[in-house]
Amino acid sequence: MKPENKSPVLDLISAGMKTVVNTLQPDLPPWPATGTIAEQRQYYTLERRFWNAGAPEMATRAYMVPTKYGQVETRLFCPQPDSPATLFYLHGGGFILGNLDTHDRIMRVLASYSQCTVIGIDYTLSPEARFPQAIEEIVAACCYFHQQAEDYQINMSRIGFAGDSAGAMLALASALWLRDKQIDCGKIAGVLLWYGLYGLRDSVTRRLLGGVWDGLTQQDLQMYEEAYLSNDADRESPYYCLFNNDLTREVPPCFIAGAEFDPLLDDSRLLYQTLAAHQQPCEFKLYPGTLHAFLHYSRMMKTADEALRDGAQFFTAQL
């Protein structure tokens, strides 16, 4: 679609979202659009520091977890000693960016609202790691903490997965992987999915929306996919195109959050409609006036805080 035909998104977003978009960080250099992935990762980490400030304080612990690919860093957020469940968080960033620091506030707020232990998994990024390595690392971390739950003093009898954007895909893919391969890591009580991509290759929202403001043009999405997948056949894998998996049975309860002006919104809508059509427990909530990645901005934006609270409440209601 010609760029001129796209929706005038920046004119339509909410006042709170406009405040975020217009918030300048004077000490921050321009985004290195033509830089290396390493430079873009460094910039992303620096840019997120401002938005992570003032997060809830709580006990945190860091552990390296063994996987067949090597050690993977994890970070535990413990809001109380007697947690009712453990929630594994997978950060977004198009599979190529992000880490435990860039999503620190999101995990802390989620832990605070749910009063559950939250474990962030710093899966290996692409293109260094190709599908399905990230999923296998996540599953390995779940198995490790399930086996060592007593030593780490965490409750692994009930677990959940949560993620934003690419992390939402990884969250649901990991839950389906455990189901399909009959791996016991505790009862999966729920999956929390904020503005994820789940396998659509084209849609109305992908055509109408997306631009330099969110890094989700058709070209951007293609670049993320090419970095993540090992080959063309992976596009149809039931752990990448999740609509090719069996969504008619034993899908854990899903909280599906959509951003109104997100090119990936139709992915969330289709996931919800598919699950609902087959009586799988799910809830869909649309957050008006928001852009993709709005969850990061709870320091300034009430809607972001609300979306985290909604997800936490959905999860605790399943326990």
From Swiss-Prot:
Active site, UniProt feature: S165, D262, H292
Give the domain of life: Bacteria
Q: Name one GO cellular component term.
A: cytoplasm
Keywords (A to Z) from UniProt: Cytoplasm, Hydrolase, Serine esterase
Kindly give the Gene3D superfamilies that the UniProt entry links to this protein: alpha/beta hydrolase (3.40.50.1820)
Where does the UniProt entry say this protein principally localizes?
cytoplasm
Record-linked SUPFAM superfamilies: alpha/beta-Hydrolases
The molecular function GO annotations come to:
carboxylic ester hydrolase activity
Query: What is the top EC class of this enzyme, as a single word?
Result: hydrolase
Q: What is its EC number?
A: 3.1.1.-
List locations, semicolon-separated: Cytoplasm
Ranges spanned by the short sequence motif Involved in the stabilization of the negatively charged intermediate by the formation of the oxyanion hole, renumbered to the chain: 91-93
Would the keyword Lipid metabolism turn up in this protein's UniProt record? no
Q: Which PROSITE patterns match?
A: LIPASE_GDXG_HIS, LIPASE_GDXG_SER
Which is an annotated Pfam family here?
A: Abhydrolase_3
Q: Please state which protein family the record places this protein in.
A: Belongs to the 'GDXG' lipolytic enzyme family.
**What is known about its subunit structure?**
Homodimer. Interacts with MalT and MelA.
Cited NCBIfam families: PRK10162.1 (NF007547)
Q: What is the official name of this protein in its record?
A: Acetyl esterase
The protein's gene is named: aes
